[in-house]
A protein has these predicted regions:
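Conserved ABC ATPase "signature" region
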Residues: 113-131
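Conserved catalytic motifs of ABC-family nucleotide-binding domains
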Residues: 157
Length: 161
């Protein structure tokens, strides 16, 4: 049996009179992919913020990586979650390589050779050339920056992305 990575049970969230989420229930199991598509303001980001513990539902329950988000140690939970920021998520003063290996380095992984190998593996995984590792974010297109953001999120080997 596969682990449930995301579970929302009858989740509702309002901002004033605007209901961003209305009785949403969903289950995403380990190994599954979910794409949430909708117009601006329809609740996509609100749902992600709830999964990451950045916002609480007005009603219902949210589970991520097997934990009740409302009861979880959020720092510990967030270490299991890779998050790609939509806009301007890269550090402009760091090379692509340093952006990718940022989380492993601050978590104690200091072996430069191993970090370079990880960066090379992940840059290839997102479809970019190794030569990009020595560039700075401003030298990349918006789409390339998004891919680097995905590589950085994967660098910590999260259970949930």
């Amino acid at each position: 049996m596969r682990m449930e990575m995301i579970r929302l049970e009858h989740v509702t969230k309002s901002f004033g009179r605007y209901k961003a989420l209305d009785d949403v229930s969903i289950v995403v199991e380990e190994g599954e992919f979910l794409t949430v598509i909708g117009r601006s303001g329809c609740g996509k980001t609100t749902m992600l913020r709830m999964i990451n513990g950045l916002q609480k539902p007005d009603s219902g329950k949210v589970y991520a990586a097997g934990e009740d988000v409302g009861e979880a140690d959020l720092i510990r939970l967030r270490r299991k979650i890779g998050y790609v920021i939509q806009n301007k998520g890269l550090f402009p003063h760091m090379t692509v390589e340093k952006n990718i290996i940022y989380v492993p380095v601050i978590s104690g992984q200091k072996d430069k050779r191993q970090n370079r190998k990880l960066a090379e593996e992940l840059i290839g995984l997102v479809g970019l050339e190794r030569e990009m590792l020595d560039r700075y974010p401003e030298e990349l297109s918006g789409g390339q920056q998004q891919r680097v953001g995905i590589a950085r999120a994967l660098a910590s080997r999260p259970k949930l992305l």
